C-alpha cells in the first residue's frame, strides 16, 4: 500500500494553466487504527470522473471525535465544491440497510468504478490484516446518493484491495478477493466474483472462480486479491471469445471463460507466469485478434535476452483452450503499474511504466515487440517521491506522474 495519503484535493489543468486546491478534512492518524503502514490515512483509492455529472467521486478516511469513518464524496469538476447530498457516510448508509460496516477495520485501496449511474467503491483491510474486516463493494447513486447497495464476503477477510479496483464488462462487475481467515468451506475469498449492477451475487459456479488450492493460498497469504480481474476479448474461427484473466500473489495466471467463471478449480488455463508475487494494476491491449496483458512482476518465462525483468507481457490467442504465452519482458527497476497508449485507440500500442521505488524513471516499450523506446533520459529526469503501485495518467500529448508533493509531466 502507499505509505502516504492524499490529504487535499487538487485539480490541475493539463496545460498547467490553473491549479485548484480543495482542502477537505480527509485524514485520520494511524493511532486510530489497529494496524497499517499509512500515516496519516486519507484518500488512497484512485477517484473516478463521471462526465455526465461533471463530478469526481472519491472515498476518504476521516477522523472525528466519534471515531474513524469512511465517506464517499462527489466534487464538482469546475471548482471542487461538494455536490448536494454528499458526502455519504458508509457506516450510516449500511446501518440503515441493516448491515454492519466497521470503518475502523476497513480500508479503501482499489480504484472506484462507475457503471450505469452508480459509483462503486471496493473495500478491504489494513496492512497487517487486523480486526474484523471483510471484502465489500458499496454502490452509491451518482445523482441520488441515498440509493446505496452493497455486497460483502461471508468470511472474515477476503479484502478487495487491488490497485485497479473493480472491473466491468457486458454490464456486469468483476472483483478479485484476498485471503480469508478460518474458513473451512469456501466463503468468498481467493476468488474472482461476478456481481450484478445491484450487487447481487449468484451462488451458481458460473458466477465465481476460486483456485482448487484456495485453502493453501489462504494459509500462505498468496491470494488473488493483489490484482484486479482483466476482461479480454480474442478472435476465434467462429467469431470472438470473452475471457477474464486473474493474476495471483503466487505468481500464477488463471484464464477464465467470462460467461462461465467455472467455480472452484474451473479455469480454462492455469499457468505460472511470474517468479514473484503479482501485486499491480495490469494493462491490456489488442494486436490483431490477440489480447496482450502487461503487469509489473518478474516473468517466469521471459524469452531471451530479457530475463529477470520487472515488466511482463502475456499474449492470449485462439485455441482450445486459448493459448497463453509470455510475449516479451521489459527491463526496469521498480514496482509501478503499467498503462498503454495508442495513436487511435488501437494502433501502435506503447506500454509505459514508472520505476517506482527503484530507478524512479519513466520507461516506454513497443507493445508488439517490447523494444525500449524511452528509458528515463538523463539525470534530470529521475523522479523523486514515487510509491509502489504508482500508475500514470495519459492525455492527448502528455504523460503525468504524481509523486509526493510533485506532479511530473512528459510531452509526447
Roles of regions detected by a PLM:
Residues 1-236, 241-263, 277-302, 309-314, ...:
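Mobile, glycine-rich extracellular loop/lid and propeptide segments
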Residues 268, 307-342:
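A beta-strand-loop signature enriched in Asp, Gly, Thr, and Trp
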Residues 269-273, 298-303, 325-331, 379-383:
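Short, contiguous acidic/charged loop-to-helix segments that flank catalytic cores in large enzymes
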